[in-house]
Amino acid sequence: MHRYSQKTGPRWIRCALLWINGLFPFLWPLRHLLRNFNYPRGIGLFFRDYATYRRKNQDPRFPIRLVDSFPCLFDRFEASGIKPRHYFHQDWWAAKKVFESKVSEHFDFGSRIDGFVAHCSVFCKVQVFDIRPLPPLNANITFIQSDITRLEHVADSSIRSLSSLHVFEHLGLGRYGDPVGSEMLQNAVNEVTRVLAAGGEFYFSVPIGIQRLEFNGQRVFAVRTVLDMYRDLKLIEFSAIDDRDELHIAADPETFDEAEYSCGLFHFRK
């Protein structure tokens, strides 16, 4: 059985590079510093949130360790943005799924606006929930600023088509100014299960591979962890983007157990 993995050297080297990227984002590119004056504040908030998460952590699957940290010191001060890796294949995969379902309205939790959401807005209305602000874009995109771990304004079993792409790995880590705590991940999973209608489709993606917490950037999930999280939903398809950024449709989940940083694409149905 072929396993998709790409070794990137000792973990401490990766950690050091991520810290350099987090502390000195103006090195790549320099213009980041010139337009962002929240540098000292971001450092302080990282350590505040690290201490809060460490004190409140009740999830033994993701122990918090400084050596695995992935400091994201500016994201909380920015509007919903753009990240390159995984996103082209991920957004194409999910938008194709929504298009083929022929729904007239789709709901999304925090996915990339200028990729997946824009694709879907061509052929259906999209209602977007995100904790960060979003300016008006076009008539087919409706935005509600909301915490997806607490969707009190969304009725039970009310959504037939739902997505959240490259979002859940960040929940509870404070990266985007969201509440800090390990319970936020499960809270969001519970909300998805609650609001999804019977027969409803859920398109979901997160980083997959060797499971770890890279505070305060993200989690990387074992595929089995994701399947356990959504045990109340039926898995329709598992596809993945490997460490070399190549897309594999209808992949074998076991081949990604040793991946370093791949992306799992999950199609669930309630």
Identify the role of each PLM range.
Residues 9-151, 155-157, 165:
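Conserved N-terminal segment of class I S-adenosyl-L-methionine
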Residues 42, 86-90, 184-188, 218-222, ...:
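Soluble or luminal CAZymes and related metallo-dependent hydrolases
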Residues 83, 173-185, 213-218:
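Short, flexible/disordered intra-domain loops and linkers
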Residues 163, 168, 172:
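A conserved beta-strand element that flanks and buttresses the S-adenosyl-L-methionine
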Residues 180-198:
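A short glycine-rich, Lys/Arg-flanked "PGG" loop and its adjoining helix->strand segment in the class I
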Residues 199-207:
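Conserved beta-strand signature within the Rossmann-like core of class I S-adenosyl-L-methionine
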Residues 223-270:
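Class I S-adenosyl-L-methionine
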